[in-house]
Amino acid sequence: VSRRVRVDYESGDRFRIAVRQHTLSVDQPASDGGEDTAPTPTELFIASLASCVALYARRFASRHGIRTDGLAVTADFSMASHPARVGEITLQLHVPGELSPEQQASLLAVTSHCTVHSTLMQPPEVRLELAALTPGAA
C-alpha cells in the first residue's frame, strides 16, 4: 500500500507538511537563515526514530505489565559531512521501575526492530524525480 506525504513551500525556509489529516511544519534556525518557527527536517527525522522506539517500548511495556508513566526516549545526534548527513545517533530509553536482565534484553531487541530503525538498517530504494511542470506555471 503506497502512502503519500506532501510538502508545500510557505515562506523563507519554512514548509508545511501534510500527512493524512495532520499538518506540521519545518524551518531552519535563525543562525542558518530561517525563522526558527519549527524543527528542521533533520530534527524531525531524529524525532521520527525516537518516537518509533518509544511506541514499540510502550507496547512492550503494556504487554509485560511494566509501568509506562515516565517512559521516554532521548536522542542525541551529530552531523557528518561529504555528503552532509546524520553521522551518529544515540538513543536512550528511559523506563520507569526495575527491569530484569531478560526484560532489558527483550525490550532492546523489540525496540531495535521498530519500523524507522529497521528502515535505517535496511535502506529503501529512494528515487528523486522531477514532476511535470503545469502549463503556464513559472
Placement of each model-derived feature along the sequence:
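Extended beta-strand/beta-hairpin segments
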Residues: V1-A47, L55-A138
